[in-house]
Amino acid sequence: MTHVRDMDEADIEAVSRIRVRGWQAAYAGLVPGTHLDAMTVEDDAARRRQWFSRPGRTSRDLVAVADGRGPVGWLCYGPPPAGAPDPAGSGEVYALYVAPDLIGTGVGRRLLEEAHHRMRAEGFTASALWVLAGNERALRFYERSGYEADGRTQDDVYDEVTLTELRYRRPL
């Protein structure tokens, strides 16, 4: 049985492990291997501790917890980044990762449904997120969850390779 709750500081190591392993599994063949190989749980956890304890942080973190296993998924959401040209009332899912051995078991869906529920309760009327072009599994997942590409793109550079992200949106 898996349930979703707010992330707390004790979850940081598990969330970093989920995020790093998630990147390495989901982005193999898309993001340069040198970048993926350089990722470590320890470095991610150190950055996450700083970020998690930042005063005035407006993002929210959720974890999916499996009985007897601890956190097996993580989602972070909140308002669009400062300066983003989003309509009033829009929120953004910044990240969603599931332990690679549990992808396709409903953990990600439960996290996303809970995030949508909380976003509506916080007054958001729409949700946006960014998906790496070519990440077909993620694109199918978000499309099944009611998201549609809105035509916006942004580029990120990983080890001198430019990759494009596509923005997806859905009403809440």
Task: List the predicted regions and their residue ranges.
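Extreme N-terminal starter segment of soluble prokaryotic enzymes
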Residues: 1-3
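Acetyl-CoA-dependent GNAT
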Residues: 6-12, 16, 20-101, 109-114, ...
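C-terminal "cap" of GNAT-fold acetyltransferases
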Residues: 90-91, 125-140, 144-172
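Conserved G/P- and acidic residue-centered "switch" motifs that form tight phosphate/ATP-binding loops
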Residues: 106
